[in-house]
Regions:
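Conserved functional hotspots at enzyme active or ligand-binding sites that engage polyanionic ligands
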Residues: 1-103
Length: 103
């Protein structure tokens, strides 16, 4: 598991399995029991705290990373790799995360 990967995660009921982006820095992941994630959703609102993803990013359909809903979860609940975001897309994600946190 690495920073910038998109993986499957099963949220608590009634939600189902959704893709999430690993936000925790790679160097820390092996030392932690939990990791910070950002959910990926097909609900696109075109706001500064979203990062648009599509086929070029390895996703089956257009969607967004929603940085308004980051959370820290058990690594045990994180599933299979879907894709890894490019360095350029991670720069965009960083800006959206800073905006979401008020920086």
């Amino acid at each position: 598991m690495l920073h910038g990967e998109i993986r499957w995660y099963r949220f608590g009921r009634p939600d189902k399995r959704h893709p999430v982006v690993i936000v925790t820095r790679s160097a820390a992941i092996d030392y932690l029991n939990e990791t910070t994630i950002a959910p990926v959703t097909r609900t696109i609102r075109d706001i500064p705290t979203e990062v648009l993803l599509g086929a070029v990013d390895g996703m089956a359909e257009d969607c967004v990373v929603n940085l308004d809903h980051i959370q820290t979860v058990s690594k045990d609940k994180i599933g299979a790799l879907i894709t890894t975001l490019s360095e350029e897309k991670m720069k965009t994600l960083r800006q959206a995360l800073l905006f979401a946190l008020g920086f």
